[in-house]
């Protein structure tokens, strides 16, 4: 852990240091019991004493999924007294003190207790209309557990509370995940109180079978009970090779965003302290995948948090009836890519695509749950293939 914090100190990565405290299924029982006070407090004291000299650590966390009670309040009080320079976080602070006879929606304190300095949530929703699932049906306990499905922006816009808002767990990376990741960050950047979030989690926790490339997980060892593949929820694979999710995270977390506004290309500087005057922007124009033009654009001196016009689409030569694309990459003085985008320079390619008759598709292979179709090259817009299984 200390080596990781040293690397964060060197690279300027903001860190939340979390106490090793999780009681999970017991919820608030232990934190509301005086007999456990010393054990809870010990976790906070050891963490702060061990890591107090790391400048990358900007706030402490009281733990994870342990309900909330007097013992957590004691941890927060000690940390505030020991180190008044750092904030104290705990997502579980919104849960009830004592869930002895089950939970109901009214048990959740939407305003969050005063002993924490951050309003924190698991998996809040974003505003985009198509990303708003309904609260699931179920028992009062199940509905209460999902009462945290608040809209992220609504929390940040509360007028009676000006604390920063954090998603201490979000963007669950199981399977082909992160489909709405960019929408999350468009919303996070839209309000100054939004502080970001922590993806669950970094690496698939599978184990390779000796001498094979087959990943084993729950149940593959004869272990019962198990959670099957639920441990495979990382941004990277078990061998730390990158996944498509990794590419999405890299693109969205980039400190420089490149966007198209009509015929113009703009850059947004998401750095906290750096202007873009010492950065460069390299470009390539491709025609049907082949490089036909490349060079470097003058990067405007964009201050932290600001946007500026980079160039116009008319600055680049285009070719009719071809797949013509503009690739842009913002590069630091150290040669590190900090932003990338690809923009289509020709829309007529798709308009020229012919409509393919349904009977031109040949069924190649089928089963009850899968149909594989083979066709000629298909150029079309707004189409779908709907297999008929019955």
Give, region by region, the residue ranges found by the protein language model.
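Carbohydrate-binding surfaces of carbohydrate-active enzymes
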Residues: 187-390
